[in-house]
């Protein structure tokens, strides 16, 4: 068990957010957490004001956000402030927290250095040298952050949440599954084209669930494959359970090494058919703990191989679940890595040594 800290956790609340899963992990790991959802500062003003503020990260709402962070720190006197992708944080706020003897942590799943060129990173990039620790998702990000002046950066991975993402009951079988080949998520990269080819060219019995972004599909394809909308929490878990084959893709436009969804599918005991990528191959053994594809054609071949083979899918899904647990692809294990890194950082900040 890592050393217990008093933590001010600045993150978006709500059961739909993985930041809440991380909060639960901290509490299970014996941390004293004061959670604060400050997203309302970013919601001030009309639509145009919000869009401009998000791009520039400046103005009265940004200043108010930073004053509130410092107020909460004064009231609660934490050992550390953990920022879960807080784009409104100003460098001066982090310097003030350090002067107060409070360590600061930045946890960000997304990639400010990727080719996707998402807006909103202007102020964030300026804060990189001021955080005491960055927790990032990619090997390349370690270099990226250090080149920007990061004091310390370590890699941890996304994870499944064991309290909500667990396997189905023991007697669960194909008679309980009404989704043949399934994808639950967003149409990043070329996924819409991939799904279109699966359904139109190869007649794959496909079901897609997710946000309204899937309206980018051709209307005929959309009407044929899209159902149930966005799935969260219990609905997401049961969507995985009800799927004979669960697809997972790497987001190349974010330079991701692995897919968060892969750990969730494995954690929930689903049969995982995922894109072949080095980060996946390091974490799951091919045809033992999951199946892989590198193209639409190979994906179709794997579907034809495994869709009629319920016993084979069950065997691989069970091995994938065992690997996810044994190798620590869960939130507790991943958050523990960050907390252990803080065991030397927090005392150093308190002594004014950083």
Locate predicted features:
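Nucleotide-sugar donor-binding catalytic core of glycosyltransferases
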Residues: 2-55, 60-76, 84-92, 115, ...
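Short, conserved structural micro-motifs that define repeat-unit consensus positions
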Residues: 83-85, 97-104
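A short, histidine- and acid-enriched strand-loop-helix "catalytic/donor-clamping" loop
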Residues: 105-118
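Conserved acidic donor-binding segment of nucleotide-sugar-dependent glycosyltransferases
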Residues: 290-296, 305-310
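Short, hydrophobic alpha-helical segments
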Residues: 307-308, 339-353
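A charged, aromatic-enriched C-terminal amphipathic alpha-helix characteristic of glycosyltransferases
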Residues: 308-340
